[in-house]
């Protein structure tokens, strides 16, 4: 095992959503099982 191997691109940091944002995401998920990254970002801006 090569200890210098990082696995490619670095991982993005995890987004912390407010309770309201989580509720909105869950509601949208009921209608659309796949939310694009753009759509998730839009929820963080509201």
From Swiss-Prot:
CDD domains under this entry?
homeodomain (cd00086)
- GO biological process, any: anterior/posterior pattern specification
One term under GO cellular component: nucleoplasm
The record's listing under InterPro entries reads: Antp_homeobox_Deformed_sf, HD, Homeodomain-like_sf
Q: Which residues form the signal peptide?
A: none
Q: Name one Pfam family in it.
A: Homeodomain
Q: Which residues bind DNA?
A: 1-46
Annotated GO MF terms? DNA-binding transcription factor activity, RNA polymerase II-specific; RNA polymerase II cis-regulatory region sequence-specific DNA binding
**What Gene3D superfamilies does the entry give?**
Homeodomain-like (1.10.10.60)
Keywords noted in UniProt: Developmental protein, DNA-binding, Homeobox, Nucleus, Transcription, Transcription regulation
Where's it found, cell-wise? Nucleus
| The family this protein is said to belong to | Belongs to the Antp homeobox family. Deformed subfamily.
Task: Report quaternary structure and partners.
Answer: Forms a DNA-binding heterodimer with transcription factor PBX1.
Q: What does the UniProt function comment say about this protein?
A: Sequence-specific transcription factor which is part of a developmental regulatory system that provides cells with specific positional identities on the anterior-posterior axis.
Task: Return the protein name.
Answer: Homeobox protein Hox-D4
